[in-house]
């Protein structure tokens, strides 16, 4: 057995065999089941991409229609979950509420303890539909608004915007969010996905695995960077400051600029390429170009001065802001997308399971160290 010691953070360590996602960080390549993310962003939908992630192949037209039908039929929440959302304290963040509600969903799943492949797929349909419903419903409840029932004639992205705002979204808004969901749907063995696989490997249930993933995504070193980007942009706008000068001041004060650099990519994050274009076009269409223009000025400066590239979080901030989405919903929307990838990994893990149990390199006091009686301790 190998006794190789990994570096801190397991950087560069291969910890699983997976056929779901491939990344070439040097070349800036991201693919789902071998298909380049650029092709999916240009040609696919979130539903089709999710089907690809779960099954390993692109669906036929009939298979896609069936997949879409199953996902829309899963748009249902037990009234007790809605009561739970209603009872959440005002201090609770949407991410905390989503995590808690998803854990509670297991109470009302008759097959919670069934970890067969078919049961896991069924639960994945339910969770994918329910994530979006929970976020939209909670946002309306906390604002004192009526809950908007799902519209089964709308696709996943459009239905979320409909339930969130109570207004049928434009084709531009729908397609923008649809592409954003595709881009965020999967990213190999990131912290939340690894957490989900570790939990699933113990033969715990799917709800526990994705609840653990949500807990990991809630951490600011994983999810939430786009929230930091947008708070910075709002502050620049509030002060009427020049974006580049503002960022120079942050750097002089040794403050981190959110949305730049990536643990895996050594060149531009391929997801940022699409989000940049979307942010620009959406801003033009909405007559609100300032968020993109501020972001672009900052990106050009950071790239030239610090040799850092924008990551997926940087332009998702201005994209969501132009869609009128509140900042504290950005990470929950990440989860609405990433449940597709989490589910794929849980299914893959349980289809060929082995408990994940690494070792730790001991760096404590030498063995054997003596036990010192209380009266002899200094």
Protein language model regions, located:
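Non-transmembrane, aqueous-exposed alpha-helical and coiled segments at domain scale
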Residues: 1-378
